[in-house]
Amino acid sequence: MALVDKHKVKRQRLDRICEGIRPQIMNGPLHPRPLVALLDGRDCTVEMPILKDLATVAFCDAQSTQEIHEKVLNEAVGAMMYHTITLTREDLEKFKALRVIVRIGSGYDNVDIKAAGELGIAVCNIPSAAVEETADSTICHILNLYRRNTWLYQALREGTRVQSVEQIREVASGAARIRGETLGLIGFGRTGQAVAVRAKAFGFSVIFYDPYLQDGIERSLGVQRVYTLQDLLYQSDCVSLHCNLNEHNHHLINDFTIKQMRQGAFLVNAARGGLVDEKALAQALKEGRIRGAALDVHESEPFSFAQGPLKDAPNLICTPHTAWYSEQASLEMREAAATEIRRAITGRIPESLRNCVNKEFFVTSAPWSVIDQQAIHPELNGATYRYPPGIVGVAPGGLPAAMEGIIPGGIPVTHNLPTVAHPSQAPSPNQPTKHGDNREHPNEQ
């Protein structure tokens, strides 16, 4: 009995010595792990196998920034996100330890990349995973406008009788031949070029406008380049948008530019909703200045025909921001996003990152090893950090864990690692923004 008591005393003495060196670990390995959070999704089964040996992967399933859990705000050093939420400077300042954000998709207009860079947060995207899907969807929309398959289907569903030549002429009114038509592409990046290759096979003459692209690409693809937006709008029978959204091209298609288009031209947008002034488009459709439009993206998402200026617009096809999607593309995007996070953990930020889009705004550069690791985590891969506080789950494939004490409170940590603080207001480098760099003319989403 005395031997047992002696052992207990010795154990208590060791516990007092170790107290403050590292927190109590409820399960998993004893080494520190950075927290990486999927902000607006709930499935991290693809990401976990890539990151589980380096980081703890959790998900928030937030539908707005207000739903991001306090634990993630305080402790996450890496974040992955889709297009559901928007991170402004005010939102980014709430993150205490964040160093890298990876947008699972090509567009990054839902993140303030300048503010992120000034706060020492790298922002990355996945520019190439859904190029084929977006190009295929764009061609589908263009063919639909020219051949009117959607409206013909609707007519049959409504019971319209179509038999005589006169009835066919009436129900298919507006259908047009494609060969010899001019397709104008605004933006000629990966997706724009993929659309051009496909469109030529259908007989389109393809022209494009892209002020950021170097000369010569038009010769390799057998297309024509124009050097002003006005020239493209004037020459095109169908205009398709393939550029990212930024502060310079918001409402690029507006009442003024619509009046520069050919009478009865078509408009397709599978890039970003903010590129098109929907009020001006609705008016142009009603007046017949635009013969038809197909939109996969909208100014306000999720889109509803019941609301907004397009609810009464004729000759309009809308899809719910799905042009980017296929199972293969989704899987490739998620794998690429997790791999980019892995590069950040094992290398330097932003130098080691493959697709960092805000390097010109970045004010700090350091290896991951000097990140302020305020959270030393047990291996709780798949944990859910979301509101209301106290709700905890494990994603499919996650390891079962003792959750008590993890949600909602944090784990106190004492360490000797140097602190990396986010400057409250750091000046932007005296370096012009290159809007053509690191951009993909559209999207996933």
UniProtKB/Swiss-Prot annotation:
CC annotations in GO: nucleus; synapse; transcription repressor complex
Keyword NAD belongs to the record: yes
Family the UniProt entry places it in: Belongs to the D-isomer specific 2-hydroxyacid dehydrogenase family.
Stretch list, region Disordered: 414-445
Oligomer status and interactors: Can form homodimers or heterodimers of CTBP1 and CTBP2. Interacts with HIPK2 and ZNF217. Interacts with PRDM16; represses white adipose tissue (WAT)-specific genes expression. Interacts with PNN, NRIP1 and WIZ. Interacts with MCRIP1.
Residue numbers bearing the Phosphoserine modification: S428
Keyword Oxidoreductase (UniProt): yes
Tissues where this protein is expressed: Ubiquitous. Highest levels in heart, skeletal muscle, and pancreas.
Pfam hit, one: 2-Hacid_dh
Organism domain of life: Eukaryota
List of residues that carry Asymmetric dimethylarginine: R22
Keyword vocabulary terms for this entry: Differentiation, Host-virus interaction, Methylation, NAD, Nucleus, Oxidoreductase, Phosphoprotein, Repressor, Synapse, Transcription, Transcription regulation
Name by which UniProt lists this protein: C-terminal-binding protein 2
GO biological process per UniProt: negative regulation of cell population proliferation; negative regulation of DNA-templated transcription; negative regulation of transcription by RNA polymerase II; positive regulation of retinoic acid receptor signaling pathway; positive regulation of transcription by RNA polymerase II; regulation of transcription by RNA polymerase II; viral genome replication; white fat cell differentiation
Residue stretches of biased makeup (Basic and acidic residues): 434-445
Annotated GO MF terms: DNA-binding transcription factor binding; identical protein binding; NAD binding; oxidoreductase activity, acting on the CH-OH group of donors, NAD or NADP as acceptor; protein kinase binding; protein-containing complex binding; transcription coactivator activity; transcription coregulator binding
PANTHER family according to UniProt: C-TERMINAL-BINDING PROTEIN, C-TERMINAL-BINDING PROTEIN 2
Binding site for NAD(+): 106, 186-191, 210, 243-249, 270-272, 296, 321-324
Places the protein is found: Nucleus; Synapse
Function: Corepressor targeting diverse transcription regulators. Functions in brown adipose tissue (BAT) differentiation. Isoform 2 probably acts as a scaffold for specialized synapses.
Residue numbers annotated as active site: R272, E301, H321 (proton donor)
